[in-house]
């Protein structure tokens, strides 16, 4: 089968008419009709039923449409992978990570990255409680906070980050600032919800720190999103443990009891083995490692 004929067929099937397909392809209606007739003759089946009101795919036509769609998808994927071997970093780059980290730490650094590599276009795919499948091409790169175990993924640790205790200036002005761990008993505590997997072990340590065993504090609010907890703290609702990098997001966020350090999480730069030689991924990895070094220099108490 001739690929040009298949391309014409796929366009006719999508548009629903020979005339419309001709406009898309820059061909006359008669040229499109001849291509389809030749293809039908070669295959020995009718691909379309012609009606006064238009054309409709036959059953063999539906089968061929799906096959051509699969071929086009595979060709596009192969072309994209071949382009990874170019020396110049260019093209689309899809990065997936959590909503909070992507909205705060990562997105704040994308301007510098894109100014350095203007031929790369970035899509940030931010999701919580779900990991996009890199092996199935749902994203090109991931920044994960659990160590990947799949053998076909390349990983590089970026850094470890700790949870610290924060409140807003507004909350402290209205309720005072805890000076000791025991003082936390007199304040509204915001914690992570129990109905979804936590992003880090012992994330609700604030309920138990300084308390007798089996007698945790009662939280004022549970939220099943770190970003939601962050917004609640900023609103002046209460005190919560948050990743330290969020302290860069708002000058109204005040660290409480800085001598207390909560659980930590490791951030990993992850991508499929087949992209090992991708220039786009290489420059992104090196850029983020440089950004991590700068972050560690500024926030020596947090990142390791």
Each language-model region and where it sits:
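Short helix-boundary/capping micro-motifs
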Residues: 11-26
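Residues within the DNA-recognition helix of helix-turn-helix
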Residues: 28, 35, 109
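Conserved amphipathic alpha-helical core elements
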Residues: 39-40, 253
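A short LG(V/I)-centered, amphipathic sequence patch enriched
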Residues: 40-57
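Short helix-loop hinge/linker segments at domain boundaries
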Residues: 52-55, 62, 73-96
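Central regulatory/effector-binding core of bacterial HTH transcription factors
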Residues: 91-151, 301-304
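C-terminal regulatory
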Residues: 133-136, 148-268, 294-304
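A bilobed periplasmic-binding-protein/Venus flytrap-type ligand-binding module shared by bacterial periplasmic
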Residues: 267-277
């Amino acid at each position: 089968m001739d690929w040009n004929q298949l391309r014409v067929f796929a366009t006719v099937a999508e548009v629903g008419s020979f005339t419309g397909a001709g406009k898309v392809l820059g061909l006359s209606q008669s040229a499109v009709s001849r291509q389809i007739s030749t293809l039908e003759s070669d295959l020995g089946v009718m691909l379309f039923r012609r009606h006064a009101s238009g054309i409709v795919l036959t059953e063999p036509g539906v089968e061929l449409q799906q096959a051509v769609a699969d071929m086009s998808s595979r060709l596009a994927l192969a072309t994209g992978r071949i382009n990874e071997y170019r020396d110049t970093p260019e093209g689309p780059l899809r990065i997936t990570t959590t909503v909070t980290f992507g909205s705060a730490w990562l997105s704040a650094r994308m301007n510098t990255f894109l100014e350095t590599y203007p031929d790369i276009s970035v899509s940030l795919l931010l999701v919580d409680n779900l990991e996009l499948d890199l092996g199935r091409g749902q994203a090109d790169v991931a920044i994960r906070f659990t160590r990947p175990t799949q053998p076909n993924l390349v990983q590089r640790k970026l850094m470890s980050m700790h949870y610290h205790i924060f409140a807003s200036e507004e909350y402290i002005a209205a309720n005072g600032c805890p000076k000791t761990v025991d003082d936390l008993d007199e304040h509204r505590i915001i914690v992570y919800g129990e109905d979804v997997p936590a992003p880090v072990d012992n994330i609700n340590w604030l309920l138990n720190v300084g308390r007798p065993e089996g007698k945790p504090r009662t939280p004022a609010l549970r939220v099943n999103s770190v970003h939601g907890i962050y917004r609640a703290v900023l609103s002046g609702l209460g005190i919560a443990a948050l990743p330290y990098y969020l302290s860069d997001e708002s000058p109204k966020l005040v660290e409480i009891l800085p001598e207390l350090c909560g659980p930590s999480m490791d951030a990993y730069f992850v991508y499929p083995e087949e992209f090992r030689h991708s220039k786009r991924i290489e420059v992104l990895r090196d850029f983020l490692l440089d950004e991590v070094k700068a972050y560690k220099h500024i926030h020596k108490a947090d990142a390791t």
